[in-house]
Amino acid sequence: MGARASVLRGDKLDTWESIRLKSRGRKKYLIKHLVWAGSELQRFAMNPGLMENVEGCWKIILQLQPSVDIGSPEIISLFNTICVLYCVHAGERVQDTEEAVKIVKMKLTVQKNNSTATSSGQRQNAGEKEETVPPSGNTGNTGRATETPSGSRLYPVITDAQGVARHQPISPRTLNAWVRVIEEKGFNPEVIPMFSALSEGATPYDLNSMLNAVGEHQAAMQMLKEVINEEAAEWDRAHPAHAGPQQAGMLREPTGADIAGTTSTLQEQVLWMTTPQAQGGVPVGDIYKRWIILGLNKLVRMYSPVSILDIKQGPKEPFRDYVDRFYKTIRAEQASQPVKTWMTETLLVQNANPDCKHILKALGQGATLEEMLTACQGVGGPSHKAKILAEAMASATAGGVNMLQGGKRPPLKKGQLQCFNCGKVGHTARNCRAPRKKGCWRCGQEGHQMKDCTTRNNSTGVNFLGKRTPLWGCRPGNFVQNTPEKGKAQEQETAQTPVVPTAPPLEMTMKGGFSLKSIFGSDQ
């Protein structure tokens, strides 16, 4: 820690600790920031000792600058810290990190302009003049390697300091990425844009290297070769060979086999791609790339036979997942862009589930995809399911209560109270001004409660529902109930039928008086 923190001493350390991290912030740079920068440089396989002087900081800046735009926040923070350290070593007075970064970027721009002017002068002295080749085909590429502001072409065809175009082989990392995509994705629709990105500006030699690197799916590779052969034969029919002698200074016109890299050398391919079309140049790399993409489209249709008409949203599927499947399938459809636009506007709403379809139709025809996703965000999710279940249970509960109460009462608004004494809305039974209902559950009369009731006649007893019941309760429903009507009918039948005695009268039984002889025998 001490070695990394010792890159600044004395006045430079005081200047370092006076610079703010942000333009309007209170925090300032400390020694721990130097220690962190040294650790990050060592993690990125760079020498932390370069932080001790201006030249070393500038080398670090040149190394980190290309990665700032696409790098992680750690790389950006490291670049900003090194910029501040460079200004401290160079004696530049800065107040915060933003000013230091502006100064460094300004110096980088000046250095880049100087190198551009130097290389332009060298090209003028050498008498080299290059023309821009217009785009060809549907790929939108120029048919030659992309040129930088300094005039040097980028990978895979680059231009050295002498202005000579030479080929740089495709990197193993690119081949590994392509093979991994084929192994993981197969021939899904996303393979085509991945191939187009990895083969940007490639020569037919590089494209054949990418195809030969695929170990699996040899049947698909054979079908791809058949498509390439058909396109090559069509090229030969459209561009027959000239019978006359070749003009001086003009390149020979490539055949279909030359474009496919079968009968042409790498040097000829580079010349065709770098020579202007007025002098016989042909963008063989872009043409061959277009043929391969046609074959990949055929493989995608065969390996992904799902039609866009079969993509429908499930009853419980979130709308976002349905949209992902829809656009993934329409990406593989071999149709023009207007047809795909019509499919998107029509089928996306038509194949949605009833809940989402009801919401999407309410949005109208001109709704954007963002508005659709926002409107259908909760449909199909746990919250939407809970809401539907709560509504169903609420309706079922309300129906059950109405059935038990024998009628449908007017619904109460939220926050309203209902009195249990008078049945009116707006107060409770405690604050009710109406006379309180009092009555005995046994006899049904007001003025006393059941515990004070003196009535013992079961025929007049009532329960709390107002129905008459015996004092000891009533029988279950599956037993024969003794109602007052049945008791009266039995009394009438008894009165009409004469009673015939079956024993002698009581007077004859008591005629002899009372005696215990029959009990104790003859001991009396």
UniProtKB/Swiss-Prot annotation:
Zinc finger (CCHC-type): 417-434, 438-455
Gene Ontology CC annotations of this record: host cell cytoplasm; host cell nucleus; host cell plasma membrane; membrane; viral nucleocapsid
Chain residue ranges for the region called Disordered: 113-153
Protein family (similarity comment): Belongs to the primate lentivirus group gag polyprotein family.
Residues where lipid is bound covalently (N-myristoyl glycine): 2
Record GO biological process: viral budding via host ESCRT complex; viral translational frameshifting
Gene assigned in the entry: gag
Motif (Nuclear export signal): 16-22
Free-text description of this protein's post-translational modifications in UniProt: Capsid protein p24 is phosphorylated. Specific enzymatic cleavages by the viral protease yield mature proteins. The polyprotein is cleaved during and after budding, this process is termed maturation.
Motif (PTAP/PSAP motif): 501-504
Protein name: Gag polyprotein
GO molecular function, one term: zinc ion binding
Biased composition (Polar residues): 113-125, 135-151
Annotated keywords: Capsid protein, Host cell membrane, Host cytoplasm, Host membrane, Host nucleus, Host-virus interaction, Lipoprotein, Membrane, Metal-binding, Myristate, Phosphoprotein, Repeat, RNA-binding, Viral budding, Viral budding via the host ESCRT complexes, Viral nucleoprotein, Viral release from host cell, Virion, Zinc, Zinc-finger
Function (record text): Matrix protein p17 targets Gag and Gag-Pol polyproteins to the plasma membrane via a multipartite membrane binding signal, that includes its myristoylated N-terminus. Also mediates nuclear localization of the preintegration complex. Implicated in the release from host cell mediated by Vpu. Capsid protein p24 forms the conical core of the virus that encapsulates the genomic RNA-nucleocapsid complex.
Domain of life per record: Viruses
Locus of motif Nuclear localization signal: 26-32
